[in-house]
């Protein structure tokens, strides 16, 4: 599956089932949001936070996801959610302890899983440099994707406000592209996120309403941060993208595709007079032969 659990973890004090708990929380790739008592390791909650079809739920006794037998790809190819990029990847989420709500840079990125013929015959899988090594039939992935096109699921990214105790989605903001930046929530009721198209935006944490946006002309992956110096509040982001976009190529609606992936450190404050000028669009026309 390639469902790593290296995504950021959040420490918090929460009241769970009427009792105060010191918890550790994570939204790993596999699509389930885990709340764990960090004093003893007890699993307290494990709700799906994105579309998840590879498993039905997490067994609260064992802590293991219960696989969906209908999505077994050993006999036929299956479109799986989440795919190997996960429902949440490197991009940092943010927790508002006063509300008990987490803001997740989530994504639905389906992937067509089919076992490699040699692997099925021998149980061995030869490493393929420069690509995913999941034991899958990637050599025939284009053919398989065409064959199973009528079953394909749509990739999308979104900012989600999620209650980790109830599993309820309070709101979500759909993005044009699936690969967007991490987020930061503030005590003033704002959550900031950059997107693949190059826009850094501020949303109302209560309802997801977009309150401010700025075109940076740079696709973003890292989370914004905020801090105060001499009474002035700043929002700063290391703008630039990476991960699968660098791996498989930039898609044509992203800022990285249009202008290039030139990383910059961008800082914002109220009443700033600095204006970021639009860069030239890259010329991608093929030279005449």
Set out the residue ranges of the language-model regions.
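Beta-sheet-rich non-transmembrane sensory/scaffold domains
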Residues: 1-289
